[in-house]
Regions:
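Juxtamembrane low-complexity tails/linkers enriched in Ser/Thr-Pro and polybasic
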Residues: 1-2
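Composition- and surface-driven signal marking solvent-exposed, interaction-prone regions
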Residues: 193-195, 260-263, 297-299, 360-365, ...
Length: 522
């Protein structure tokens, strides 16, 4: 064989071997990267979590948050202090990585724990190749040397405590695969426990079903459950201009007596109630009621106050009355009185199948009230308008109004009247007269632009819906409302700028919540 031929063969072989070596190196590096990508962050989340926020693209999510109308008005989403800190330093951190954040690090998860406050949260993210070194460089550059961090051992793992400029302390659990941060060292310890003993949120079958991979992932997803209201429910999050949308699904089908399972027993209703609500209404609910027994039983379970035997007996009598006479829809509302400094007026409106018979039976019911129970106040008074006098009936003491509306009323007195084919109930006579007079004058909510805009995003057929103008609602210190989670009140400085619209629809046993937060521009 000629020398030239041997040289060609040697060069060709070297190139082939070099390419093969490079291919193998790339394959193993890709395999390692895929291994990191497959790390399940949910295996770190303690089972005590009440809500979880997750995004697979933190940069895109932050960009969408910055593009919201509220952000442009310097009203930033501060419901998570950890996220606020991350957002503050995210672009700085990105500058430290010339090729951008790794795919693993771009995924972020925050778990929320009871009692719900800005400190009882944990932030998690995966780490790709080189991310650990990136974080170390970032910490060395931006953490003050005047207050050096301290490291503690817990079950063989390092927890580093960093003092913050505002006096808080940030606990960090950092490995080559992931990072977990919290203002509570004890929460980081529970993260380590979940990671080591394998008892995490990932092992909860209800949560695992809700968090199953999706074909079309949203920019962010929230998983939440509320005791007595709903089990783990998935909400895809979308942000645009004046709106924050949460489109959800709840597969929970267990036998727990939750509000979601009560909805499954009801038929849907159609149409929005704006024409039958005062223009000053700032909160209302509307729902279908075809199974009164389950709805009344749920309300009875939610009531925490002490009831006398007389009140329990009256509750049963009025429950039977409603089951015999009420129709298939229920509307509850809060609205302003003429003196806006007074506590809000409250009215429950029920459709009635036969008004004449319902009124006759109501008169019979109040006639059974004993002289001692009646007291000196008359059982029947009148609400006078320009065209008519409406009889107003003072019912025996009952807690059904609170059970059906979710309003924590300070009194067990209830007043009733019939108006436009509906039974109206209220905790005081003034609420009834104010309601009737506003509607008689045509002063209804349907004319409000904010109301109509919110309805545009909702379905005309549903099982339950809610509207809450938080700015007005937060001024009602005496009103505790069952259907509005305390989370909104604890973050009132941000949410007071929003109106909440929520709708729950049931199809084939699956509940589909649809929540819209509309920003009220100045």
């Amino acid at each position: 064989m000629k020398l030239r031929t041997r040289v060609k063969i040697a060069i060709t072989s070297s190139v082939v071997l070099l390419c093969a070596g490079f291919a193998l190196y790339s394959f193993f590096r890709l395999s390692a990267a895929e291994g990191k990508k497959d790390f399940n962050l949910y295996e770190l989340v303690p089972p005590s979590a009440s809500a979880v926020f997750v995004t697979d693209d933190i940069l895109e999510f932050v960009a969408e948050v910055d593009d919201l109308a509220c952000s442009k008005n310097q009203q930033y989403l501060h419901v998570s202090k950890l996220f606020s800190y991350l957002k503050q330093y995210l672009y700085t951190l990105q500058e430290e990585a010339p090729h951008g954040l790794s795919r693993q690090m771009n995924q972020m998860l925050i778990s929320f724990h009871e009692p719900d406050n800005i400190h009882n949260q944990v932030l998690y993210c995966r780490l790709g190749e080189g991310d650990r070194q990136l974080i170390d460089r970032f910490v060395q550059k931006y953490v003050s040397s005047l207050y050096p961090p301290k490291t503690f051992k817990y079950k063989g793992e390092d927890i580093t405590i960093y003092p913050m400029a505002d006096g808080d302390f940030l606990a960090c659990y950092l490995t080559s695969d992931f990072m977990a941060l919290s203002y509570q060292k004890k929460l980081i310890e529970t993260v380590i426990d979940a990671h080591k003993n394998g008892k995490s949120l990932a092992d909860d079958p209800t949560f695992a079903e809700a968090a199953a991979p999706k074909k079309s992932p949203a920019v962010a997803t929230v998983y939440a459950h509320l005791e007595g209201m709903m089990g783990w429910t998935e909400f895809d999050m979308k942000l645009r201009d004046d709106f924050i949308y949460f489109t959800g699904v709840c597969h929970e089908t267990d036998t727990c007596f939750t509000f979601m399972n009560v909805l499954r027993q009801q038929e849907s209703v159609e149409g929005f109630p704006g024409e039958a609500l005062p223009s000053t209404a700032f909160y209302f609910t509307k729902q279908g009621v075809t199974d009164w027994a389950s709805l009344l039983s749920y309300g009875d379970m939610q009531e925490t106050g002490v009831r006398t035997s007389d009140v329990r007996n009256r509750n049963r009598e009025l429950s039977h009355y409603l089951m015999e006479n009420a129709g298939q829809e229920l509307v509850a509302c809060l609205f302003q009185r003429e003196d806006t400094l007074q506590e809000a007026a409250a009215v429950l409106s029920l459709s009635v199948s036969d008004v004449t018979e319902a009124e006759r039976m109501l008169r019979s019911l109040i006639n059974t009230v004993s002289a001692e129970e009646r007291g000196k106040a008359p059982l029947i008074t009148f609400c006078y308008t320009a065209n008519k006098a409406y009889p107003v009936y003072r019912l025996p003491q009952t807690t059904l109004f609170t059970q059906l509306t979710g309003f924590a009323e300070p009194t067990s007195h209830t007043y009733a009247t019939f108006y436009e084919g509906r039974l109206l109930l209220a905790p005081d006579e003034n609420s009834l007269s104010r309601y009737i007079r506003q509607l008689d004058k045509g002063e209804v909510l349907n004319g409000a632009i904010a109301y109509r805009t919110g309805m545009d995003n909702l379905s005309d057929s549903y099982h339950f819906m809610l509207m809450a103008d938080f700015d007005h609602l937060f001024h009602q210190a005496a009103k505790q409302i069952h259907f509005v989670p305390d989370f909104f009140l604890r973050n009132s400085e941000f949410f007071r700028n929003f109106i909440l619209f929520a709708q729950f629809t049931c199809a084939d046993g699956v509940i589909y919540p649809n929540i819209v937060l509309r920003y009220k521009s100045e």
